[in-house]
């Protein structure tokens, strides 16, 4: 398929927007960019479709806040959505990579902390 680019879905809060202040409202993105994520997205877009996924985008003001935040940092993406699209990979700060082994999965869930709270 000429021109086909596989989709990469990237979570907004905690992956792009550092989210160190926590939830302030759908239209509020007060925290800085996660260092280097702009360059990663730019690189991925050479051969992938990049879609930003966030429950924040369910509200019009949230979708606009994401759009404005990306524009502020000169980040171009292929879409913003509130639902997870079919993708080859999902980049999320609140995920456990399932390896097919369920032995310690419940324990991993109980002990999980996103990178923004690891020191707490």
Each predicted region: which residue ranges?
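Catalytic phosphate/metal-binding cores of nucleic-acid and nucleotide-processing enzymes, i.e., regions
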Residues: 1-120
């Amino acid at each position: 398929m000429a021109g086909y680019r596989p989709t990469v879905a990237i979570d907004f809060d905690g992956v792009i927007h550092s989210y160190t202040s926590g939830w302030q409202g759908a239209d509020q993105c007060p925290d800085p960019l996660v260092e280097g994520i702009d360059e990663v997205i730019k690189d991925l877009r050479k051969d992938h479709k990049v879609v930003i996924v966030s429950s924040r985008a369910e509200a019009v003001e949230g979708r606009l806040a994401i759009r404005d935040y990306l524009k502020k940092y000169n980040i171009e993406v292929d879409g913003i959505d509130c639902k997870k699209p079919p993708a080859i990979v999902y980049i999320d700060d609140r995920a456990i990579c399932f390896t097919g082994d369920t032995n310690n999965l419940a324990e991993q869930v109980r002990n999980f902390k996103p990178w923004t709270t690891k020191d707490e």
